[in-house]
């Protein structure tokens, strides 16, 4: 009687087995709603970046930081997708180097990144490092050396056939042996891509700030904003002065 009452309320047939005394009956009678499985399937295929949005079939979540975001369909071609993964990771690493390279000199009072050519070299073009002359050349010479060195390294990397080794070469590039623990390595891959994307956004922010306030660095912009948040903000740039005069 109790089971009939429960079933009339929409409770599945698991309830009678739950009321019985044997665990085997409970396990055997465990039903699964077809509708529930369909719902879970739809949920699992939902893009993580926007709940309810369908996840592209080629973004299966296996790549580090894959949240199903590809609104332009750039990764539909498998070869292109691999190339984009590699390019994103390399640009993320450059951005993570650039952000502290921009912030630290300004924080030390050496100057901002926009005016680096004014404080990173003394008259005559002699390169300096932390204010001290570099004995082996001028800025153009150092830039040429860096260009050739990076070109050589990038050429060597491009010759690698294994797509994973292109992105994670290991060996001398993993002196602390982080890749030896597979589970930890996968976790670090996700952390790297997340921090890299944040650094890419920071670089965009630095460039936008500098274009709006010429010759200023990010820390100077931050200090100006904190001094008067109501007036010194993005609205001060995009909203005409005549609408909201000071």
UniProtKB/Swiss-Prot annotation:
Positions annotated to bind chlorophyll a 4: 195
Chain residues that bind chlorophyll a 1: 69, 88, 197
Highest taxon, organism lineage: Eukaryota
Recorded GO MF terms: chlorophyll binding; metal ion binding
Binding-site residues for chlorophyll b 4, renumbered to this chain: 157
Membrane topology: Multi-pass membrane protein
Cofactor remark: Binds at least 14 chlorophylls (8 Chl-a and 6 Chl-b) and carotenoids such as lutein and neoxanthin.
Keywords, alphabetical: Chlorophyll, Chloroplast, Chromophore, Magnesium, Membrane, Metal-binding, Phosphoprotein, Photosynthesis, Photosystem I, Photosystem II, Plastid, Thylakoid, Transit peptide, Transmembrane, Transmembrane helix
Listed Gene3D superfamilies: Chlorophyll a/b binding protein domain
Binding-site positions, chlorophyll b 2: 93, 134
Function: The light-harvesting complex (LHC) functions as a light receptor, it captures and delivers excitation energy to photosystems with which it is closely associated.
Quaternary structure (record): The LHC complex consists of chlorophyll a-b binding proteins.
Domain comment, as recorded: The N-terminus of the protein extends into the stroma where it is involved with adhesion of granal membranes and post-translational modifications; both are believed to mediate the distribution of excitation energy between photosystems I and II.
Protein name: Chlorophyll a-b binding protein 6A, chloroplastic
The organism of origin for this protein: Solanum lycopersicum
Gene: CAB6A
